Amino acid sequence: MAPIKIGINGFGRIGRLVARVILQREDCELVAVNDPFITTEYMTYMFKYDSVHGQWKHHDIKVKDEKTLLFGEKAVTVFGNRNPEEIPWGGTGADYVVESTGVFTDKDKAAAHLKGGAKKVIISAPSKDAPMFVVGVNEHEYKPELDIVSNASCTTNCLAPLAKVINDRFGIVEGLMTTVHSITATQKTVDGPSMKDWRGGRAASFNIIPSSTGAAKAVGKVLPSLNGKLTGMSFRVPTVDVSVVDLTVRIEKPATYEQVKAAIKEESEGKLKGILGYTEDDVVSTDFVGDNRSSIFDAKAGIALNDNFIKLVSWYDNEWGYSTRVVDLIAHIHKTCQ
């Protein structure tokens, strides 16, 4: 079968890591990248060297000319257009476009890519109006007529598989989530202006910063039976990658913590293998850098108050795990449309 041809709009943290994922897969081909803010030469540097995930060592990357990068012998077309409708994706053969600028996250804005010849757009962020899919949870509900979809957020990708298992096995009455989340590119290195979120403008490397997140509520969109039952918040902490979800839930069907652990372990080795992980090791956050699973349940970190009230802890590489799911979702969409 011919590889799935993919273009990337926005060569930031997620854009570059999605590119790394694509280039390591046999079933996918990176054909084009658009970013108006960096040159091809700088693109090669940013792709090759990564402070978190290390140096790219799979094949040489070099500039062929202003409009072309070479990954080994593979040519990738480079554009520098600010307006999505002006990017000629069709000319490169890119059927799927990963929208990873963080700017064009609603359906109307993301639809501009279709004008340039793309057939499907996958938004690598939550969307207010595009249907959201979480691989392992609701991707089977994708219909071929949907041209613009969202891969939800990294936190929703961690929380949803765990919540699905607990809800399917024991029933969730209600719950609260906290994510202890690594810093991201939108934060400030030193105190600076942030009109919409005053706390978010404080120095990222020096503070624990309470923040809002729609990740828990978004679970209700991918699992309608949980709509209105979960909400949550975030603490931004001074680590550069890997985050952890703390999910505290009241369950309908009484169960010991051992029974809950056993259910999660069983699912992690079955239907959710590769998506949901399970560990009983004494792990810390850096142990999950580069982990491509969406959610790794930490059996030793959780606790139960009684047989109906439990706290569950699950790790995720909010960069690499999420980027892997973006490409998995594209592969699923492609298969569904055949």
From Swiss-Prot:
Active site annotation, chain numbering: C154
Binding-site residues, D-glyceraldehyde 3-phosphate: S153, C154, T155, T184, T213, G214, R236
SMART domains: Gp_dh_N
Binding positions for NAD(+) per the UniProt entry: R13, I14, D35, R82, N318
Cellular component annotations (GO), alphabetically ordered: cytosol
Cytoplasm is among the record's keywords: yes
Top-level class of the enzyme under EC nomenclature: oxidoreductase
Pathway membership, UniProt: Carbohydrate degradation; glycolysis; pyruvate from D-glyceraldehyde 3-phosphate: step 1/5
Enzyme Commission number(s) from the entry: 1.2.1.12
Subcellular compartments: Cytoplasm
Keyword annotations from UniProtKB, A to Z: Cytoplasm, Glycolysis, NAD, Oxidoreductase
Reactions that this protein is recorded to catalyse: D-glyceraldehyde 3-phosphate + phosphate + NAD(+) = (2R)-3-phospho-glyceroyl phosphate + NADH + H(+)
Disulphide connectivity of cysteines: none
Annotated site residue numbers, Activates thiol group during catalysis: H181
Gene Ontology MF term list: glyceraldehyde-3-phosphate dehydrogenase (NAD+) (phosphorylating) activity; NAD binding; NADP binding
GO biological process: glucose metabolic process; glycolytic process
Oligomeric form and interacting partners: Homotetramer.
Miscellaneous: Plants contain two types of GAPDH: cytosolic forms which participate in glycolysis and chloroplast forms which participate in photosynthesis. All the forms are encoded by distinct genes.
Family as reported in the entry's similarity comment: Belongs to the glyceraldehyde-3-phosphate dehydrogenase family.
Protein purpose: Key enzyme in glycolysis that catalyzes the first step of the pathway by converting D-glyceraldehyde 3-phosphate (G3P) into 3-phospho-D-glyceroyl phosphate. Essential for the maintenance of cellular ATP levels and carbohydrate metabolism.
Protein name: Glyceraldehyde-3-phosphate dehydrogenase, cytosolic
